[in-house]
């Protein structure tokens, strides 16, 4: 029966909701984007809100807010340090701040951009509702639905291109200039530190699921079909985020093995092709090796392991960082470590922050991790009694894009919490002696003195015999820091202790030194000496920040392990550039982290990584961390800024594997009859058993 005009059925939300439920069922009911851009008071949704052009320009690559509902609940349980402001959640982007710093009288939005974007979405939603005959609403509705794979792909592959203002390549540009970890590890038989050793990186607590022998579905680069096809591969070796894969069918032939980063969207659990109607095609090199690929795969897959179905979803969730461009905070002054300065977040890449000093030039920056002990919320210095540089005249930075986006101070609970201290029964006192890592020469552990005791467990420490007499070289450590040690720590652990300047007696003797200086050593019970089972071993490879030039991340080796203390050696550099770091330092990363986040990795400066460079640069006088720094790459001023555009994903993968663009050939794809087989399931398994995606297997044969 024909319906009267004007009474046609309008699209309702019910089919869309059913479709969403179906999507979630495929992945265990988990959708990492359900709360991505939702407001605190709106319903949870897996849709993406349509943003205006102004908002898209404001977004920086790698800056993704955390779930606002989670932050809002956390805010209610924590008091803001030193301020009586209540927490507020932006209804557009979900960022958390203080109400007094938010935009407009209603304090609903963090910036003008968010307010306009929200208004634009509301208007579009109202127009759409009128066209569909629905009652108007004031809420900003979702206008488009994006597939979960598209969202993940956009996030993992679009980390930004080009260079930062300081000349650091990012995103695809960084990958083009990337270091070949696979060849480096294979040629020298090196071992990489496991991802589980690094508690500040994505999926560190789930990387035990990645094991030798597990099966995955990967892009088939050895096929001449016009569309993207996949094939099953086996993990031969795991090295950080990178794995050595071998296509099924090559068996013991390692000539076609290839390295791949598991964080990319071209690696999937078994069954992904069947679910997403993708074709499994054997590589051309071995397509004639078997006549019945289906039976072969069934034998190879039964009882094997694969990645969890929500592996990439959790990867994306773990790569969302609460810091955003425009947030204000306090950071150590790199020109005088005894004080802090006000700074603004300019860039966020993989949790690492590029900070711009408010009273400096547009290129006066400082790099650190968001968990670094060198950054603090606004007001921290005044509260604990630490020195801060108060600028009488603020530089005119109105032309700088970052300073035009300042909208709120970073709230205290975004920073890593320090351990609570209890001063009853004795505490650190001024004049006490101890041993500490020199922040201006990170390869040395020196004799040091407590110069001032601050509030909340913070201590101002100076190296004995230092050049400064005005306290400008004092530095702040928390009492729970793993960079300070009781007297005789170096002696007990066979570490060379740097004595005070002018001290002639060798070896250094603490007892005679304390008697000579009429001082006492800090009690050993006051130091935090717990040692976790971190998993680091001598010789392991990793990626480490050069703290003398903290925007650089370099190929490095664990040279020595002393309890939880690691001596990091930069491959290709002299031993004088070695650095002591804690096993939980946020400045060390697993192999493949730079590739995963789109950060440029600095390769060794010589072909032999363990041979110190004998050239001019390796033997020059050592520089201070916050002073004039040595350069590993050309400076931003002398290097041209490279403009580049994003490449198609297929082209990127083919270039990475050294394969030219496939040319369509006369190939017949033969469908294989679908069969089902029940698989045994063990009692406990670190990763799921494989389904048999035989319905998606196709075979190539010559015409």
Swiss-Prot record:
Q: Where is this cross-link: Glycyl lysine isopeptide (Lys-Gly) (interchain with G-Cter in SUMO2)?
A: 405, 647, 673, 698
The principal localisation class reads nucleus
- Whether Endoplasmic reticulum counts among this entry's keywords is no
One MF term in the entry's GO annotations: methylated histone binding
Residue segments, region Disordered? 1-70, 604-649, 672-703
Enumerate composition-biased segments (Low complexity).
Answer: 35-49
Q: Which domain of life is it from?
A: Eukaryota
Pfam families linked: MBT, zf-FCS_1
Q: What keywords does the record list, in alphabetical order?
A: Chromatin regulator, Isopeptide bond, Metal-binding, Nucleus, Phosphoprotein, Repeat, Transcription, Transcription regulation, Ubl conjugation, Zinc, Zinc-finger
Q: Where are the zinc fingers (FCS-type)?
A: 81-116
- What is any one GO biological process for this UniProt entry? stem cell differentiation
Query: What residues does the Glycyl lysine isopeptide (Lys-Gly) (interchain with G-Cter in SUMO1) crosslink join?
Result: 698
- Would the keyword Nucleus be found if you checked this record's keyword annotation? yes
Which positions does UniProt annotate for Zn(2+) binding? 90, 93, 110, 114
**Modification sites for Phosphoserine:** 13, 67, 338, 681, 685, 687
Protein localization: Nucleus
Compositional bias segments (type: Basic residues) = 619-634
Biased amino acid composition, Acidic residues? 15-25, 50-60
Task: Please report the residue spans annotated as repeat (MBT).
Answer: 179-283, 291-391, 397-500, 508-604
InterPro entries found in the cross-reference section: Mbt, MBT_L3MBTL2_rpt1, MBT_L3MBTL2_rpt2, PcG_chromatin_remod_factors, Znf_FCS, Znf_FCS_sf
State a GO cellular component annotated for this protein.
nucleus
What does this gene product do?
Answer: Putative Polycomb group (PcG) protein. PcG proteins maintain the transcriptionally repressive state of genes, probably via a modification of chromatin, rendering it heritably changed in its expressibility. Its association with a chromatin-remodeling complex suggests that it may contribute to prevent expression of genes that trigger the cell into mitosis. Binds to monomethylated and dimethylated 'Lys-20' on histone H4. Binds histone H3 peptides that are monomethylated or dimethylated on 'Lys-4', 'Lys-9' or 'Lys-27'.
**PANTHER family associated with the record:** LETHAL(3)MALIGNANT BRAIN TUMOR-LIKE PROTEIN 2 (PTHR12247:SF64), POLYCOMB GROUP PROTEIN (PTHR12247)
- Relate the assembly described in the record: Part of the E2F6.com-1 complex in G0 phase composed of E2F6, MGA, MAX, TFDP1, CBX3, BAT8, EUHMTASE1, RING1, RNF2, MBLR, BAT8 and YAF2.
Q: What is this protein called?
A: Lethal(3)malignant brain tumor-like protein 2
Point out the gene that encodes the protein.
Answer: L3mbtl2
